[in-house]
Each structure stands twice: as C-alpha cells, then as structure tokens.
UniProtKB/Swiss-Prot annotation:
HAMAP family: Acetyl_esterase. This is Acetyl esterase. It comes from the Bacteria. Keywords: Cytoplasm, Hydrolase, Serine esterase. Displays esterase activity towards short chain fatty esters (acyl chain length of up to 8 carbons). Able to hydrolyze triacetylglycerol (triacetin) and tributyrylglycerol (tributyrin), but not trioleylglycerol (triolein) or cholesterol oleate. Negatively regulates MalT activity by antagonizing maltotriose binding. Inhibits MelA galactosidase activity. The gene is aes. The active site is at S165, D262, H292.
C-alpha cells in the first residue's frame, strides 16, 4: 500500500497515547535500525527500563527449568500465599526481542490485580530458535511446574496463559497444543490475549495502519515471520496460523484485547468472531485511541492499566 494512502495514525491516537509517543528518554541512544538483532535487543531492553519502574512489590523468585532444548529461565510472582490459580505469561517482541525484564511491570500488575501466581517464561528468541521451539519450551515449563507444584508452592490445579503481541500467539498456541496432544498440566481456565497476531497474511488494518512508530510495517511483519519460522510450510501450521486449528471445540475462555490503531487488529476481530460463531467462550474489548504495545505504558496511561485489570478480572471470573 502506498504510504500516503495509510491513515494519519499519529493525528488520531488519544491524548494519553500521544503523551507516551512524545516522551523522550535523553539517555537513550538512537534506535539501531540497521543494526544487528543483538543491538536491537539491547536497545529494546534499555528503552523498556523507564516503563517498568514503580511496579507492585511482591515475593519474586527466579528459576531455570529443564526442556529438551536446555534450561529456560522463569520468574515467579507470588502476590499471596494461597493463590487460586497460576498464569503463565509470554512476552511480546516479534519473537526476536524481549525478556522477563522488559515485561516485568506487566507481570507484576497482572499478579496484583488477579491475586494469582504469575510465571513468566523466558522462551528462546528467534532466529536462534525456530518454530515450534518456543511453544515446546513453554509446554515443557508448564509440565515441569505441574509436576513440581508443591516444591514451588504454586497451585497448578487451574492455570491460564497470557501474552501480548507475539506472546499472545504463543499463549493461545500453547493452550491448543496442550488440548490437541492431551497433555495434563491442570485445567486451562482462561487465555488472556492482548493485540496478538493469529495467522492473517493480509487485512484491512494491515493495509491502513502500521509505521515507524510501532515497527509493524508489512516489511517488519515479514522479517519477524522469517526469523521465527523454520520453512515456508510452517506458515500454514495450526500452531502458527491458528485459524487452521480447530476453534470449534474445547477452546479455553479467551479474553481478546484490541488496540484501535494496531495493524494486527483484524487478527483479534477474526479470532473473536470465529470463536463466538462456534459458541466458544470469549470476550472482545477494543481500547480506543491506542497503538500496538500500549500495555507497556501503564505508568502513564490509564487505558493500559484498565486493559490489565480487564484481563485479570476476566481470568478470575473463570475460576
């Protein structure tokens, strides 16, 4: 699509979203647009530090868990001694960026608002890891904590998956993987999905939206996909294009959050419409005036805090 034909997104976003966009971090170096992935990861981690301060304090523990690919780092947040359930959180970042630190505040707020134990899984990033390694690491971590629940003082009788952006795809893909392969890790009570991608290759919002402000141009999306997938056939896998999976039965209750000016918004709309058409429990909420990745900015945006509260309330309502 000719760039001039796209919507003037930065003129249309909400006042609080504009404040975020215009927030400068003087000590931050320029984004290494032509740099290596390692340099981009370093920048992303530095940039997110500002947005992760002043998060709720609670007991937190770090553990490494075994998988067939090696050990994976996890971080457990304990908001209370007797948690009613455990939520596994998968961070976003286009499969190539992000870690437990970049999403620490999100996980702490989710634990605080739900009063459920939250476990962040630091799955191996792409292109070092190719599909479906990240999903298999997530499932392995889930199984490990299910088997060792007493040792870690967690309640694994009821669990959930949550994630933002690429992490939302991993969250739903992991839940479907457990269902399809009949793996018992406790009852999956719900899945919380913030502005994810679920398999669309083109859409109205992908044409009208996306730019340098969100890193979601058509070229960006292609780059993330090429880094994540092992081969062309993976594009049609039911654990990458989730619309190729069976969404007509036994899908855990899904909270689907969309950002108004997100090029991935149609993925969320289609997921909701598909699940609702087949009487699968789901809820969709659109957050007006927001860009992709707005969940990070709860330090400054009431809407981001609201979206986290909404997801937490949806999950606890399923327990």
């Amino acid at each position: 699509m000719k760039p001039e034909n796209k919507l003037p997104v930065l003129d249309l976003i909400s006042a609080e979203m504009k404040t975020v966009v215009n927030t400068l971090q003087p000590d931050l170096p320029p984004w290494p647009a032509t740099g290596t992935i390692a340099e981009q990861r370093q920048y992303y981690t530095l940039e997110r530090r500002f947005w992760n301060v002043s998060a709720p304090e609670m007991a937190t523990r770090a553990y490494r868990v075994p998988t067939k690919y090696g050990q994976v780092k996890t971080r457990i947040f304990y908001p209370q001694p007797d948690s009613p359930a455990t939520l596994f959180y998968l961070h976003g970042g286009g499969f190539i960026l992000g870690n437990l630190d970049t999403h620490d505040r999100i996980m702490r707020l989710l634990a605080s608002y739900s009063q459920c134990t939250v476990i962040g899984i630091d799955y191996t990033l792409s292109p070092e890891a190719r599909f479906p390694q990240a999903i298999e690491e997530i499932v392995a971590a889930c199984c490990y904590f299910h088997q060792q629940a007493e040792d870690y003082q967690i309640n694994m009788s009821r669990i959930g998956f949550a994630g933002d952006s690429a992490g939302a795809m991993l969250a739903l893909a992991s839940a479907l993987w457990l269902r399809d392969k009949q793996i018992d890790c406790g009852k999956v009570a719900g899945v919380l999905l913030w502005y994810g991608l679920y398999g669309l290759r083109d859409s109205v919002t992908r044409r009208l939206l996306g730019g340098v402000w969100d890193g979601l141009t058509q070229q960006d999306l292609q780059m993330y996909e090429e880094a994540y997938l092992s081969n062309d056939a993976d594009r049609e896998s039911p654990y990458y294009c989730l619309f190729n999976n069976d969404l007509t039965r036994e899908v855990p209750p899904c909270f689907i959050a969309g950002a108004e000016f997100d090029p991935l918004l149609d993925d969320s709309r289609l997921l909701y419409q598909t699940l609702a058409a087949h009487q699968q429990p789901c809820e969709f909420k659109l957050y007006p005036g927001t860009l992709h990745a707005f969940l990070h900015y709860s330090r400054m945006m009431k809407t981001a805090d609201e979206a986290l509260r909404d997801g937490a309330q949806f999950f606890t309502a399923q327990l």
